[in-house]
UniProtKB/Swiss-Prot annotation:
Natural source organism: Aliivibrio fischeri (strain ATCC 700601 / ES114)
Gene name for this UniProt entry: ttcA
InterPro entries in the record: Rossmann-like_a/b/a_fold, TilS/TtcA_N, tRNA_Cyd_32_2_STrfase, tRNA_thiolation_TtcA_Ctu1
Residue span of motif PP-loop motif: 44-49
Name of the protein in question: tRNA-cytidine(32) 2-sulfurtransferase
Class of this enzyme: transferase
Primary localization class, coarse: cytoplasm
SUPFAM superfamilies named among the record's database cross-references: Adenine nucleotide alpha hydrolases-like
Residues the record lists as binding [4Fe-4S] cluster: 119, 122, 210
Similarity comment: family membership: Belongs to the TtcA family.
């Protein structure tokens, strides 16, 4: 990271503290990291995974428990991929790491017709390789760099295109049932990560597969959410809070809630029917940090009390 001015250092410290706090809260709320864990931190070379590794290394220094980190990057043999960047960066950090070389690029190019999205196949191939690598390394947890915006986008994708009220959980058991997958940045906003990565000046490596494909469903949902966030500040926070405050009895999934057993002797369930009530919308919980302008300590005034 290049040398910062006094004002820039203040704003960097403030942002780092915010991301660190949000990450720590997510880890605590979902019990993501336990004593003795060996965590495989998946490092793609993008802003999210760089930030995740950075914050986890910081938390490791002050955590009341002991855990190990090993950074893993999957070199998918994309043309022009700068294979030297991550090893050099990780060597400087002094963190344990492993570069896994697998030519998934050729497989994707061979199987997917030109113009079609490659994300689904690429994701499945990458997932299988990472699960295998985690087993080889003796990792107990696999850490992915998805943030709050990713989680919300996934929920809307499933609603709009899959007909499911399903998101991206902060913690789950891997597809093969052998590992626990965690998302430590689940409480972090993408806009904060973008600012932080820019201040950190990470050696970002763009993805030539998914990053060059316009008009994808996820991009449309991202644009929709960004528009809402600009027009109605606080909506993103409110929607994420809703994902943590689910009332199955007031939805329509009879597999989740036993509607058939309800009768006139059941009594009021979760507040009863609100269909006839006047809607009372609570004040949007705008993030306090977002409402505060950046501060330059050099402009601070000395206030003198006058009797």
């Amino acid at each position: 990271m290049s040398e910062l001015t006094k004002a820039q250092q203040y704003n960097f410290n403030k942002l780092q503290k915010k991301i660190r706090r949000n990450t720590g809260n997510a880890i605590a709320d979902y019990n993501m990291i336990e004593d003795g864990d060996r965590i495989m931190v998946c490092l793609s070379g993008g802003k999210d995974s760089f930030t995740m590794l950075d914050i986890l290394m910081s938390l490791k220094k002050s955590a009341p428990i002991s855990f190990d980190l090993i950074a893993v990057n999957l070199d998918q043999k994309q043309p022009g991929f700068p294979a030297h960047i991550l090893p050099e960066y990780l060597e400087k950090l002094g963190v344990e790491y492993k570069i896994v070389e697998e030519d998934t690029y050729s497989i994707v190019q061979d199987k997917i017709p030109e113009g079609k999205t490659t994300c689904s196949l690429c994701s499945r191939l990458r997932r299988g390789i990472l699960y295998r690598t985690a087993k080889e390394l003796g990792a107990t947890k696999i850490a992915l760099g998805h943030h709050r915006d990713d989680i919300l986008e996934t929920m809307f994708l499933n609603m709009f295109y899959g007909g499911k009220l399903k998101g991206m959980p902060p913690k789950l058991v891997s597809d093969n049932g052998e590992h626990v997958v965690i998302r430590p940045l689940a409480y972090c906003r993408e806009k904060d990560i973008i600012k932080y990565a820019d201040m950190r000046d990470y050696p970002i490596i763009p993805c030539n597969l998914c990053g060059s494909q316009p008009n994808m469903q996820r991009q449309n949902v991202k644009q929709m959410l960004n528009t809402w966030d600009k027009q109605f500040p606080g909506r993103i926070e409110t929607m994420f809070t809703a994902m943590q405050n689910v009332v199955p009895s007031h939805l329509a999934d009879f597999n989740t809630f036993d509607f058939k057993s309800i009768n006139r002797d059941s009594g009021v369930i979760n507040g009863g029917d609100i269909g006839f009530d006047k809607e009372e919308m609570p004040t949007l919980p705008v993030d306090a940090d977002d409402a505060v302008a950046e501060f330059d300590p050099s402009l601070k005034l000395d206030v003198v009390n006058v009797d």
